[in-house]
Amino acid sequence: MRRALPALVLLTSACTVTGTAVPVGGNLALVDAGRTSAALDAVKAAAEAVLSYDSGNPGAFDQAVAANVTGAAKDQLTQLFDQVRKSPQPVHLVTRVRQAAALEFTGDRVRDLAVLQQDSSGTNGLATVAFTALRDGGRWRLSDIAVNPAQPAPAPQPDDGSTGGLRDAALAGARAAAGALFTTDSSDPAGSYARAEAVVTGPLLDDYRAKKATYVEAIRKSGTKVALGPDPMAAALSLGGGRATVLFFTTLQVTDAAGRVTGRPFTTELDVVRAGSTWKATAVRPVTAA
């Protein structure tokens, strides 16, 4: 990613929240596929409207906020765009939602995990955001915005063959696979590799085994210890036939040889497949700016 955009810098500092889980059985994400998709489309339109800005037409931004935002998100956006609106230079900021998946959907409330790309004067930036939106008078309005989110997962449904149970089993499997794939320790490179190999299958496993020596040496030379951040985020982009594609986000905690810890936001897609009582990854696609 090239130079970070002011909007993304402000979002990161101003809009991180914890969130809450919904009761078991209350999460209809992908269970009611049609309404889930419609809610995601509405949140996408709202997010792109209120996270874009043209200094030549500031009234359009105010109108977008009035139409698409409620609750805490109003103050978050005011704080977010304060610096942008005061810029002495012309600003033409365009935001688009690259990917989005529902974390939870209850009919009148949706929380989704979205990858945003912002472009301004040839510069682009990427951020992963959790949006909460409420259905108000037939219209979906953003009520909370969290960039680089760390929020607890909704209460899982039983893995009983239902769509909700399959979804939550796949998400738990994806989080477990991510923990093995993206957690490394330069003082134990062989163990780090072994943990990763144990959670992959298919051509990805073949690739790991073919490059084992390279992976182990790279981990050893890194001189770091990498762990997932608290409350990693996972949402299903697609689900069916014992397979799922999952959008995953965490702020990796990277500890260097001197003990200094740096947070590194990390977003990826994971393809996972059921393998007996567990789930294994068949593909890993880190999300980067276009």
Language-model region placement:
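Short beta-strand edge/turn micro-motifs at domain boundaries
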Residues: 124-158, 245, 265-290
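Juxtamembrane and targeting peptides
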Residues: 2-45, 111, 127, 146-183, ...
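Core segments of small alpha/beta cavity-forming domains
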Residues: 31-86, 162-221
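Intrinsically disordered, glycine/charged-rich N-terminal periplasmic/extracytoplasmic linker segments
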Residues: 70-78, 82, 96-105, 110-111, ...
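A compositionally biased, intrinsically disordered/low-complexity signal enriched
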Residues: 40, 50, 69, 102, ...
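A mature extracytoplasmic/lumenal domain signature
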Residues: 81, 116-118, 146-149, 212, ...
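Surface-exposed, charged secondary-structure patches
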Residues: 86-123, 220-258
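A broadly structural signal marking compact, well-ordered functional cores
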Residues: 16-22, 196, 206-214, 220, ...
